């Protein structure tokens, strides 16, 4: 309902699940009821029989082209070319590598925050090494993914809009690599710190809308909701 209330022209979802055994209409039918008649979607994992996780873009305007971007066999972006009257622009719906923490990792972090002295134990030191390597691996993978997207952005035949979940902060290499030459909608019209992640880690801004200089941002909003540990953004 909150998407319907926003009356958006284009909606980019980085993760949504369709369960084949549930008696529910597919997402494209739901969005058509919001006048978002055009869509493109791609599954992260092609062989899931019960539930499939998708990245998807829904639009009030015609979509004339769809491109998947993969890095190390992982889907990291869905590109769509959208036609508005006589103009075409390219939307990058992006979902970069996460740090892939599991429940055990989060429990370790909570325990470490509550009792710093516990980090001296052998088991806690082993757990801290696992955390370090996951963070390091995430940074390295996002850096490569960002460079790949940068190359595609620079060769785009149309003005671009880049949006999505970068899983990284505004100080990161990934953010600055992708943002080069683009305008951050939050920096133009946002207010406050702009945090979009409210999970078990420190609150940070990891979701972005970046615009080609041809576009002018009129407003930016973080949409408060409780169905996820990340907030939705609107520009």
Which residues does each predicted region cover?
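N-terminal signal-anchor transmembrane helix
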Residues: 1-6
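Acidic/histidine-rich, surface-exposed loop or edge segments in extracytoplasmic proteins
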Residues: 7-13, 128-132
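Structured beta-strand-rich core segments of catalytic domains in phosphoester-bond hydrolases
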Residues: 10-110, 216, 221-225
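Second-shell loop/turn segments in exported
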Residues: 15-17, 132-139, 161-164
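Soluble or luminal CAZymes and related metallo-dependent hydrolases
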Residues: 22, 72, 134-148
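Short hydrophobic/aromatic-rich motifs at helix boundaries and adjacent loops
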Residues: 49-51, 117-123, 147
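Metal-dependent phosphoester-hydrolase catalytic domains
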Residues: 68, 81, 140-161, 166-235
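Active-site-proximal loop/helix segment associated with metal-binding centers of metalloenzymes
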Residues: 93-138
């Amino acid at each position: 309902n909150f998407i319907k209330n926003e009356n958006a022209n284009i909606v980019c979802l980085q993760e949504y699940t369709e369960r084949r055994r549930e008696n529910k209409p597919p997402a494209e039918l739901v969005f058509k009821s919001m006048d978002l008649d055009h869509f493109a979607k791609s599954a992260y994992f092609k062989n899931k029989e019960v539930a499939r996780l998708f990245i998807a873009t829904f639009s009030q305007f015609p979509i004339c082209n769809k491109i998947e971007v993969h890095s190390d066999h992982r889907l990291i972006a869905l590109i769509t070319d959208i036609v508005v009257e006589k103009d075409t622009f390219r939307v990058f719906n992006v979902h970069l590598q996460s740090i892939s923490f599991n429940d055990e990792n989060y429990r370790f972090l909570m325990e470490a925050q509550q009792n710093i002295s516990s980090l001296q134990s052998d088991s806690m030191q082993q757990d801290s090494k696992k955390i370090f390597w996951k963070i390091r691996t995430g940074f390295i993978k996002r850096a490569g993914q960002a460079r790949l997207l940068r190359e595609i952005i620079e060769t785009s035949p149309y003005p671009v809009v880049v949006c999505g979940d970068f899983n990284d902060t505004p100080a990161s290499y990934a953010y600055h690599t992708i943002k080069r030459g683009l305008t951050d909608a939050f920096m133009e019209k946002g207010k406050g710190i702009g945090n979009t992640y409210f999970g078990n880690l420190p609150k940070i801004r990891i979701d972005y809308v970046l615009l080609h200089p041809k576009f002018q941002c009129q407003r930016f909003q973080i949409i408060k909701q409780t169905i996820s540990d990340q907030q939705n953004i609107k520009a």
